[in-house]
């Protein structure tokens, strides 16, 4: 069984809709050996807004022009579907519900079928196994685990750090990924035809996201 760690970056989230500008991933084996790592740039067909809610700037991993040279989401949809729906692969993300939201809303924007896959959230795993920690952000968690951080917000690197967090929790708890998932069912999400389910909620994105289309600029 292999593991796929992925992360998504967006050019902006105007209108409540994240316009994907990159999807990065790391494919690893059960011992966390990296088999493949790639950052797939996406033309967001929307301008970049590089400010957080607190006013701090966000540094892009590449010049803006590189993103606008890339294929758009519709062109890359088959590749993303192949990655996320591959058999014999367990999918992980950090705060993965956000990435799921971005994917589904782009499916609405580009009139593509919804993805169907399962995913596990390393943020929830960290919260479950490290209840004494107050950190939720990937960078801060890496700091507490003494994982070197160089290039946050390049999608493939964030995916790599997500893998390192999962690996570190396994080491601390003297178990493997399957052991973590068995003990923490709350980290599980299923995505099927625009409906996202986890331990606490069932969320239908279908009607909610359809209303975002008019906000796309």
Please tell me what each predicted stretch does.
Residues 2-105, 143:
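Conserved non-catalytic scaffold segment of RNase H-like nuclease domains
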Residues 77, 156-159, 163:
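Short, amphipathic alpha-helical "lid/cap" segments that border enzyme active or binding sites
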Residues 167-217:
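Acidic two-metal-ion nuclease catalytic site recognized across multiple nuclease folds
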């Amino acid at each position: 069984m292999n593991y796929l760690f992925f992360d998504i970056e967006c050019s902006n989230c105007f209108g409540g809709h994240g316009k994907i500008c990159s999807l990065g991933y790391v494919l690893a084996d059960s011992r966390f050996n990296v088999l493949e790592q790639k950052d797939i740039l996406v033309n967001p067909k929307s301008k970049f807004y590089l400010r957080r809610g607190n006013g701090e700037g966000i540094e892009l991993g590449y010049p803006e022009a590189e993103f606008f040279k890339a294929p758009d989401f519709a062109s890359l949809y088959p590749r993303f579907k192949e990655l996320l729906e591959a058999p014999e692969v367990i999918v992980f993300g950090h705060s993965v519900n956000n990435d799921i939201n971005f994917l589904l809303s782009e499916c609405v924007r580009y009139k593509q079928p919804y993805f169907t896959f399962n995913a596990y959230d390393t943020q929830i795993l960290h919260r479950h196994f490290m209840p004494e920690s107050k950190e939720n952000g990937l960078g801060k968690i890496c700091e507490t685990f003494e994982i070197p951080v160089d290039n946050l917000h390049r999608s493939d690197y964030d995916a790599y750090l997500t893998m390192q967090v999962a690996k570190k929790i396994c080491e601390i708890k003297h178990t493997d990924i399957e052991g973590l998932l068995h003990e923490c069912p709350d980290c599980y999400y299923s995505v099927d035809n625009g409906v996202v389910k986890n331990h606490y909620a069932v969320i239908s994105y279908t009607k909610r996201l359809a209303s975002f289309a008019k906000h796309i600029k």
